[in-house]
Regions:
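Amphipathic alpha-helical segments used for helix-helix packing
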Residues: 112-134
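Short, solvent-exposed beta-strand-terminating loops
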Residues: 173-177
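Amphipathic alpha-helical packing segments from all-alpha helical-bundle domains
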Residues: 78-85, 98, 130-156, 167
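Helix-turn-helix
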Residues: 25, 33-67, 71
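Generic hydrophobic, amphipathic alpha-helix propensity
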Residues: 22-31, 47, 68, 72-76, ...
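Conserved hydrophobic residue
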Residues: 39-40, 131, 160
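N-terminal intrinsically disordered/low-complexity leader segments
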Residues: 1-21, 32, 88
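Hydrophobic alpha-helical connector segments
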Residues: 85-117, 157, 165-172
Length: 177
């Protein structure tokens, strides 16, 4: 006689952990796809394949490709706000003359760690639509304000070149990508 084996159902905690891991894989795969190929050229099928998950899980976890894009961009912006927020906070401890130099180093290091940020901006900048507006409101405008403020303070001290802050913003962003 063959003994019956008991199969234990996965615990609720395991299901939640698995769902979070799946969502994280999808967000990371989507970010890679959207930042390199763009929104229109990235199919949900290819994103699910890159994430190594079953077909249909984008619809299950996010509802739509647009909501996945928002989740991926939000993840990237949250990372940006956290990492660059820490860098900005540390600038307050630096003397006035060192702030600009430390800022540039922190921003270039961040862009090296997360090249998807500027890649996504380039991809979305090709089409004027809701995604570009979302990025501008959520990331570019607030960050631009910080950059201009730091540059203007350095210019007042004579430790920054004599040109407009917006030129500096584009020079640093271009150099960092």
């Amino acid at each position: 006689m063959i003994a019956a084996q008991r199969v234990q159902a996965p615990s609720c905690e395991n299901k939640i952990r698995d769902a979070k891991a799946t969502k994280r894989k999808l967000v990371e795969a989507a970010l890679a796809a959207f930042s390199t190929r763009g929104y229109e050229a990235s199919s949900t099928r290819s994103i699910e394949a890159a994430a190594g998950v079953k077909r249909g899980l984008i619809a299950y976890h996010f509802g739509s490709k647009a909501q996945l894009w928002t989740a991926a961009a939000d993840y990237l912006m949250s990372t940006t706000e956290h990492d660059l927020g820490e860098a900005l906070a540390s600038l307050n401890e630096a003397d006035e003359a060192a702030r600009l130099r430390l800022f540039v180093r922190a921003y270039v290091a961040f862009c090296a760690r997360y090249p998807e940020l500027n890649r996504l901006m380039i991809q979305e900048g090709m089409d004027r639509d809701w995604r570009l507006d979302w990025l501008l409101e959520r990331s570019v405008r607030p960050w631009y304000g910080h950059v201009c403020r730091i540059f203007d303070q350095a210019a007042e001290l004579g430790v920054a070149p004599n040109f407009e802050a917006h030129h500096f913003y584009y020079i640093v962003t271009g150099a960092a990508t």
